Amino acid sequence: MQETFKFLRCNSQGEAVEDKYSLETLKNHFVVRDEYNNLFRVFSSRDDFWEWEAAQPFEQKCFHEVVFGFLPQRLKFDIDFPVNKSYSNDNVDENVDDIVNDDDNVYDILDMIINVIMDVFYETYSLPYNINLTREQILLTDSIGLNKKRELKYSFHIILYTHSVLNNNEAKVFTSKVLENLPKHVYPFVDPQVNKSIQNFRIIGSHKKGSMRVKMFNEELADVFETSTTTKKSDTLIATPFETTCLPCIFTNVKETTPSSCDTIQQSELEEVLKFAGTLCKNHCFLRVHKNLVLFKRTSPSYCEICKRMHDKDNTLILRVTGNKVYQHCRHDNKHSLLMGSLSGTNNFVETYVDQVMTKSIEVHESILFEELPDPQKHIYDESSMREYERVPTLVVKAQMKIGKTIQLRNYLQKYYGNNSISKQQTIRFVTFRQIFSKNIQSRLPNFTLYSEVTGDLDSYERVIIQVESLFRLTSTAEPVDLLILDEVESIFNQFNSGLHKYFAPSFAIFMWMLETANYVICLDANLGNRTYNILQRFRGDVPIFFHWNQYKRAQHDMYYFTSSRETWLNNLLKDLLEDKKIVIPTNSLMEARLLQSFIQKKFPEKKIGFYSSKSTAHERESHFNNVSYYWGLVDILIYTPTISAGVSYEDKRFDVLYGFFNNMSCDVETCCQMLGRVRELKSKCYKICLQGKQNYFPETIEDIEMFTLQKRDTLFQTISNHQLSFTYNKETGRPIYYKTPYYHLWLETMRIQHLSKNHFITRFINQIADTGAKVFILTGEKLETVKQYTSIKMEIKHQDYVNIASAETIDANKALLIKQNLKEGITVDQQDLFAYEKYKLLEFYAWHGHKITPKFVEQYNSFMTKQNYTGRVQISRGKTVYESLTMLQTQELNFHQWAMQHAEHHDLQYNYSFQSHMYAIMLLTKCGFKCVQDPNILTNEQLMAKLVDEFVQYDLSAVSFEFKLKKPNKTDPQTILKFINKVLGLRYGLKIHHNKGNYYIKNTKAGSLIPFVRQQIKQSPCVVSNLLPITETSSVKEETSPIKETFTET
């Protein structure tokens, strides 16, 4: 059944589609433009059209699908390769005509376009939403032949036929992102105008009027590009594709009364989800599931906890499942929701990734540069014990723990430096990264001198075991050392960036002298990486590296169970404790360690807990770590943080299972994995790991890190324009010259590893475990009532800390300095003195000495964000204008930088320069139309949106996102840009551009409201005395005053 119309849009003659059909009703019909007869045809269904179309003569098959922009639609691309067509665009190669003169070049370009589409899809949907696209989900059609001018023309349609976007705006921006990523000479072949609000798109089997080029399936294309082989006609249609996966709304701001949905709730999960409805079901009954939403029908009036009022008519209740969390929503309030709880069996990212590892759909081994060495420079094998080490100038050994690396090292020393060897009198230096590791090594090499057991000059001892921080006790001599041993070499390199060195410069200098000049160097590590290769290649490049690698998988019998759910992890832990199992719990979070200790003590007061952290006394660490066999043999539960790593090993088979809790806010993946091996033998060989990590956006390559680092220092030498925040180089100071020293290169390598861990903590952790040969599984478990108790204890611990600090002794600067020195030198400090020192630092930070403080004060003002905002506000309000403040800060940091480069380069690299972050934050604020952080003016919605579009479409925000470690926003969406700007302003100043009743103004965040700008010091609370001159209100909006005035307190 069909109806015909002369026009699509309404007109006075009543002959248009819109005269009879509303946009809403057109959703359920199929609209076709008949080019041959110059008509629009409305069919009841697609099937009706296909049946009618089959009966039409070939020359009249000029049909185009009418795609309405407001409807969901497939992503599509129209590719044209005309012959002998001139292009006036300067960006196009002069030889563009020749590009399409043979099929091979056409196919090369087409393949390039498909690859870019897949790359943009991966960045937009796969990474954040885990929605994948393969070539088999891409459909290619062609229409090759002569056009109306009798010229040969290649034309292709690329359709992502298994996915759809919400509307034409989503499709339009996705297409623009593809175009941005195409090479300039390819850009003209892609039509950017195929996503209009009403779009005609040729239907399969049709041709344009006057041309015999028919759009058709092409098996050859599918074979060449490995794309879909479907010949189902409906797969080529664009509009209302019900059988597709609807992609998340990314680029446009669409208001909906129903929260967005994504993954479909499985039937196995529905029963558990419905349990969260609880008492809500007294007034509602289950209606149906729509993707990740559970919809309910109202049976009687009820009170809504979200709206805080009664609802008595419509069906307002919705439960949404995101990840493993269940949220309550109300259709009347789309801005707020209530967290109901967590599902025990819902797979989150960790579980999904483990599942992919289990099915071997992911390559877990990360190749390193040593593996690429030529065969004569490698010895690779797979045996349960180590083979003899080679006598070569630079030997690098990689093997898992407990395969015999140290045993073979002893054999090496005996063979080449024993009593019967010609080298027995030669100098050997064995460098370690921890004091306890040094003692551990000496117990296995008794003929070596331990640096901590002798005083004075160490050069007179031929064989010395020495920790990194004490290398300054050695001196360079005319003769190089014969053998330098670097056990746990990656950790040694890490230690140079620890900030714990009292005499960094001489220690690093002697290390580099030995590394560059030693006759022989042996590096050993189970977690060997590219950092070691790059450092050796750079500083021992004159001698070849030899790679000795035993690939034996000693961990092949170990079983690792992963989860992202703290609740699942805790329930498993509680179950094992109830079964009286002895547990090892490593974690890289001090708060989590303390929380677990308190939680277990309350649940199981009879159990003995061993607890070690950075807060443990120096005496306890030294005595216990030197005799772990005794002390750990006394406990039922062992909890520790990264204060225990390599060098501490418990060999007895006492503990049953290990529970690890790790996140990406602390040490890197390699250190976390090392922590798992401190107890060498578990009875069950079972490891249960909870991994948590927020998304980070740190620069990951050496090139990006170097660019970011030098850029921060580069801006210190530039002159600021008062009007546009543009820069020129200062004639007096000139451009900076950077000396790339050995430490600089080591620092870059270390930053790269840290950033990789922060950005990809979960995947790298699981990969490294799986690469050892261990079996990996998803951790599941019964649901128990533990989370509320756990959270309650966490709040108790935090509150007690606040109480302890607030009630601690008020000490003066002299005592504070003494405590600081004792802590730095490892001298035990009394717990009460530690709280007093924390109190002193808090009062000193805000210049709040002489005031009595409460636990609430400590909670609010000792937070990282409040302190960061306070510092930012102080720095930006020192001058009469923000530009004057910026110049003052720039001068201060430039002076430090120049001093550091002359005296202590490591201080420069470890210093957190803040000028550039202020410069970017103020730049964003001014581009929005505000003059400074205290601007009281108000912008209308139209004014701000226009600014966001005009100012940011052409502005590259990469440097800003690097600076603040934020994801770069989509520049085509003003609301996304505003969210990005508010994150920056919130991090730097505790401010945001707030929206209220169609107007925008600067307002404090929660942290910012604690530290108001004032003209003169006030007594009520810490504040920022601002020198910024007041700004005159110029807004046309007179009836409303910006709340920024509330933050500027007069006395």
Curated annotation (Swiss-Prot):
InterPro entries: P-loop_NTPase, Replication_origin-bd. Induction: Expressed in the early phase of the viral replicative cycle. Coiled coil: none annotated. Pfam families: Herpes_ori_bp (PF02399), Herpes_UL52 (PF03121). May be involved in DNA replication. Belongs to the asfivirus F1055L family. This is Putative helicase/primase complex protein.
